[in-house]
C-alpha cells in the first residue's frame, strides 16, 4: 500500500502513487472518495486508464484519467502523523487574515484548491476567526462549511471514528486556537 504524503508536501505524482481498488483517497474540493475500479476506457477516441471514484459525501461517481491524477491533486488519505500536525495548526492561535473580504476569499480559495489538509485547516481557522467578529458572506459561509467537512471527513476516516467525534475534536481545537489568540492579544 502506498505511503500517504505529508500534508505539508506536494501531492505525489502519478508515477509515484498507484491507487488500488477499495482504497480511500482524497479528491480536492470533493472530499474522501473510494477507488471503485481502474480500467481502460476511450473518450473522444483517446484510450487511457481511468480511476473510477465514488465520492463518499454524496455517492456520486467520477472518472479521472490516470494521466490527470497529479493535476487534480488526487492523493491517499493522510497518515496519523499528518492528523497530529493538523491539530497543532488548528490549536496554535496563529491566524493570518486579510482585512478586505476579496483578498481573503481569493487566498482561501487558492488554499482550498490545493487539497492539502494543512491549507484547508488554515482556511477553516481563518474563517472561524472572521465569523467571531462579523457575519461571513454567503460564499465564505459555504467555504467554511466545505473546509470543515473535508477536515472532519478525513480525520474520521484516518482515526476510524465517527464524523461526529471528529467534528468535536475539530471544534475543541478551533476553540483552543481562538482562546490562545485572545490571551496573546491581552498580553
Predicted regions and their residues:
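Conserved hydrophobic positions within beta-strands
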Residues: 33-35
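Charge/polar-rich, low-complexity and marginally structured segments
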Residues: 67, 72-187
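A short macromolecule-binding patch
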Residues: 52-67
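Short, surface-exposed secondary-structure edge patches
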Residues: 13-18, 42
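Short, solvent-exposed secondary-structure boundary/capping segments
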Residues: 41-52
Amino acid at each position: 500500500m502506498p505511503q500517504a504524503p505529508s500534508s505539508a508536501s506536494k501531492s505525489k505524482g502519478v508515477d509515484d502513487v498507484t491507487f488500488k481498488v477499495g482504497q480511500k483517497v482524497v479528491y480536492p474540493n470533493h472530499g474522501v472518495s473510494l477507488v471503485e475500479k481502474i480500467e481502460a476506457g476511450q473518450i473522444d477516441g483517446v484510450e487511457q486508464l481511468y480511476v473510477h471514484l465514488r465520492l463518499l459525501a454524496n455517492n456520486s461517481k467520477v472518472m479521472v484519467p490516470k494521466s490527470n491524477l497529479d493535476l487534480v491533486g488526487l492523493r491517499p488519505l493522510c497518515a496519523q502523523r499528518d492528523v497530529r500536525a493538523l491539530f497543532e495548526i488548528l490549536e496554535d492561535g496563529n491566524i493570518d487574515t486579510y482585512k478586505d473580504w476579496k483578498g481573503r476569499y481569493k487566498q482561501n480559495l487558492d488554499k482550498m484548491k490545493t487539497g492539502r489538509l494543512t491549507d484547508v485547516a488554515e482556511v477553516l481557522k481563518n474563517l472561524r476567526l472572521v465569523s467571531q467578529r462579523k457575519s461571513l458572506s454567503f460564499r465564505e459561509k459555504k467555504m467554511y462549511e466545505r473546509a470543515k467537512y473535508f477536515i472532519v471527513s478525513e480525520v474520521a476516516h484516518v482515526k476510524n471514528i465517527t464524523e461526529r467525534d471528529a467534528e468535536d475534536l475539530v471544534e475543541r481545537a478551533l476553540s483552543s486556537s481562538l482562546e490562545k489568540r485572545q490571551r496573546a492579544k491581552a498580553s
